[in-house]
């Protein structure tokens, strides 16, 4: 499969290095998934979600996250789903045009 999107692989908040201390490169689905996670974190919505205790307002913030993620032109509109398994743990699924389904990306907000 052709590598359309390339990025440095991030694990936690650090660049992942190989045994020779060179950055690992990720592509396509992993790159898109990583971009989704970073978009949510950089938007400030994750911080708002952590601070919010009202279930109704938490659902509103999650809806804002869905709308933010759906702006990514690599994703099929209407396929983004974000569920909160428990406080601080989100699972994101979406469908891409080129690479199929992105299954259950986990986003931990308290780490």
Swiss-Prot record:
Q: Which domain of life is it from?
A: Viruses
InterPro entries assigned to the protein according to its UniProt record, in alphabetical order: Phage_HP1_Orf28
UniProt-listed Pfam families: DUF2590
- Protein name, per record: Uncharacterized 12.7 kDa protein in lys 3'region
